């Protein structure tokens, strides 16, 4: 295994954090062919530790039931939208309720390898709950620096797992360099591992997220025509592209999917870079989306490179469209997701209309987290029901109300 710059290909020492010292590119682990070949023979089983040869860790990954989430064919929405083969990878069924559990298991293994007493991370919510969950399982301390104003369910979840949570004003507002500096400084001061889940700062954690692509390839089998991902910092999308490249090297798949990233138009750093033809993603001075999981003002150029290399696109959606699809996924598919999970599905009508996907293609939407993570829509609906006067104890009254 080597740690190479994605741009200049200069090698860095394993364990290096941050960007390439020669050209400021993003570092990434790369594996020899004989290691990648295990993807053709890996035995089915629980958890993602069976893929450990393709992760930059030696310590076993703690297992709480993460991975092997279902790949579900759409029951109704696909037909309504005009797609014959729409599937949902439901990552909300991971132990803490989001795909970040794959990162949580990986960051804990990295902390154990480093001999750290604990780990520190910055989070908009799902990383916090995953880090807290897997630190608890491994007996490590967990410190979360949380952006104020995030959904209370995510805060409660992290606290319930024993994490120390410190709201820090403007933890993202100082840009990626500022976020990196506070993480590294706090980690050094406490003897903790700096577990910022963003490849330009920590190039190792996203490797565990690649396991989503391995599982999709095993279930289909092969690769979908299109994989649609919500995008905040860009690690989820990048990890899937890396996974599919490895699957192709191993001979497991014979073609690669087109990667589609989806952002809110109220927090669109990747969307703007893609539309402008930029080589880098310029951090924005704001992120005003109400979709908590993707309300991030900066995205790494690794996601931009993955979209372009795959022949994919970046789509923008209105927050309201994600909330409507969140409701419809529950009512029409029986899948309760947070708004960030609904973003890929909300982008499908526009992608179809613009010819970026075809009605006959196999399209997989990655549903990143469960509905309880950000349940404002459900809370509003419940409040509306609670505000109604109760019906009389009468059959006709109940039937009449049910039919109304």
Where are the predicted features?
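PLP-dependent amino-acid enzyme catalytic core
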Residues: 1-404
């Amino acid at each position: 295994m080597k740690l190479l710059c994605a741009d200049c290909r200069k090698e860095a020492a394993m364990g290096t954090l941050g960007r390439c010292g020669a050209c400021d590119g993003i570092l990434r682990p790369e594996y020899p062919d004989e290691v990648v070949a295990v993807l053709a023979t890996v035995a089915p089983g629980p958890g993602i530790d069976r893929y450990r040869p393709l992760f930059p860790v030696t310590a076993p990954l703690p297992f709480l039931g993460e991975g092997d989430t279902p790949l579900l064919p759409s029951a109704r929405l696909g037909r309504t939208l005009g797609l014959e083969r729409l599937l949902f990878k439901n990552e909300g069924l991971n132990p803490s309720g989001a795909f970040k559990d794959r990162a949580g298991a990986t960051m804990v293994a990295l902390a154990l390898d480093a001999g750290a007493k604990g780990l520190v991370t910055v989070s908009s919510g799902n990383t916090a709950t995953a880090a807290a969950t897997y630190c608890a399982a491994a007996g490590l301390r967990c410190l979360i620096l949380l952006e104020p104003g995030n959904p209370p369910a995510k805060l409660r979840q992290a606290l319930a797992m024993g994490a120390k949570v410190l709201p820090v004003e403007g933890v993202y507002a100082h840009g990626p360099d500022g976020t990196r500096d506070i993480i590294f400084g706090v980690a050094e001061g406490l003897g903790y591992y700096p577990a910022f889940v963003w490849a330009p700062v920590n190039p190792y954690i996203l490797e565990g997220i690649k396991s989503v692509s391995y599982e999709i390839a095993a279930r289909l089998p092969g690769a979908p025509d299109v994989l649609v991902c919500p995008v905040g910092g860009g690690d989820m999308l990048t990890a899937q592209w890396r996974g599919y490249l490895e699957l192709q090297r191993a001979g497991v798949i014979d073609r690669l999917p087109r990667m589609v990233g989806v952002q809110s138009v109220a927090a669109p750093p990747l969307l703007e870079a893609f539309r402008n033809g930029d080589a880098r993603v310029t951090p924005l001075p704001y992120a005003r989306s109400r979709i908590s999981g993707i309300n991030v003002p900066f995205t790494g150029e690794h996601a931009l490179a993955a979209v372009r290399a795959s022949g994919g696109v970046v789509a923008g959606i209105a927050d309201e469209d994600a909330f409507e699809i969140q409701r419809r996924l529950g009512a029409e598919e029986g899948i309760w997701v947070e708004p960030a999970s609904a973003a890929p599905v909300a982008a499908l009508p526009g992608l179809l209309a613009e010819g970026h996907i075809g009605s006959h293609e196999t399209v997989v939407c990655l549903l990143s987290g469960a509905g309880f993570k950000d349940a404002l829509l459900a809370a509003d609906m419940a409040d509306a029901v609670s505000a109604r006067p109760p019906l009389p104890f009468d059959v006709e009254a109940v039937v009449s109300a049910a039919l109304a």
